[in-house]
C-alpha cells in the first residue's frame, strides 16, 4: 500500500505509528512531485480518498485519468457532479460517518466507516478492469463540459 500526502506533524506521527503496527506493508511517500504522482497513480489499481470534507476532489479526477479505480467518501455535491460529468467512471462510494462539525467525524461511527472503506476497496480490487476511457477526464474534456454547462446556464448554445 502506498500512502501519499502529508497532514500536520501530529497527524503524520499517528499515521507512522499505525503503519508500523499494520500487517499490511505500507510505504509513506509523503508529498510527491507531479511526475512521481503520475507514476504512482499508473502503478496502482485503486485510489482511495476517505475524506470528510471536499469541494471538487481533483485528486480523484487525476487518479481516474491515470487508469485507477476509485473509492471515495460520498460527500454532498461530489457524487452528483462526478456522475454527471464523468458517467461510467469506476468509482465506489462509501457513506460518510456522522459529523460533529464540518470536518470532524463522530468517533463512534469510525469503525463502521473504516469497515465500509475496507469492503469497498476489496470490491474495487476484485472488479474486472474498467472500460472507462481516461481521456474523458483530460483537462480539455473536463473544461469543455464545464464551459458547456456555464454557457447553457447563461442561455447560450455552446458547442
Where are these regions (language model features)?
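Glycosyltransferase donor-sugar binding loop
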Residues: 1-13, 28-31
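Short hydrophobic beta-strand element within catalytic cores of glycosyltransferases
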Residues: 69-72, 77-79, 83
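A short alpha->beta transition loop at the rim of the catalytic pocket in nucleotide-sugar-dependent
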Residues: 45, 67
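Short alpha-helical donor nucleotide-sugar binding micro-motif in glycosyltransferases
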Residues: 31, 39-44
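Aromatic "clamp/platform" in nucleotide-sugar-dependent glycosyltransferases that forms part
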Residues: 52
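Short glycine/serine-rich donor-binding loops of glycosyltransferases
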Residues: 57-60
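A charged, aromatic-enriched C-terminal amphipathic alpha-helix characteristic of glycosyltransferases
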Residues: 105-119, 125-154
Amino acid at each position: 500500500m502506498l500512502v501519499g500526502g502529508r497532514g500536520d506533524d501530529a497527524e503524520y506521527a499517528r499515521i507512522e505509528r499505525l503503519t508500523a503496527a499494520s500487517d499490511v506493508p505500507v510505504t509513506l511517500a509523503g508529498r510527491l512531485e507531479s511526475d512521481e504522482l503520475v507514476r504512482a497513480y499508473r502503478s496502482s489499481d485503486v485510489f482511495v480518498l476517505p475524506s470528510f470534507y471536499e469541494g471538487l476532489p481533483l485528486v480523484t479526477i487525476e487518479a481516474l485519468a491515470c487508469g485507477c479505480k476509485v473509492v471515495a467518501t460520498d460527500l454532498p455535491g461530489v457524487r452528483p457532479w462526478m456522475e454527471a460529468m464523468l458517467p461510467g467512471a469506476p468509482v465506489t462510494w462509501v457513506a460518510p460517518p456522522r459529523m460533529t462539525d464540518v470536518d470532524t467525524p463522530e468517533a463512534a461511527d469510525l469503525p463502521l466507516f473504516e469497515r465500509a472503506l475496507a469492503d469497498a476497496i476489496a470490491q474495487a480490487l476484485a472488479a474486472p478492469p474498467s472500460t472507462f476511457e481516461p481521456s474523458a477526464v483530460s483537462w480539455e474534456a473536463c473544461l469543455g463540459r464545464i464551459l458547456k454547462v456555464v454557457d447553457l446556464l447563461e442561455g447560450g448554445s455552446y458547442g
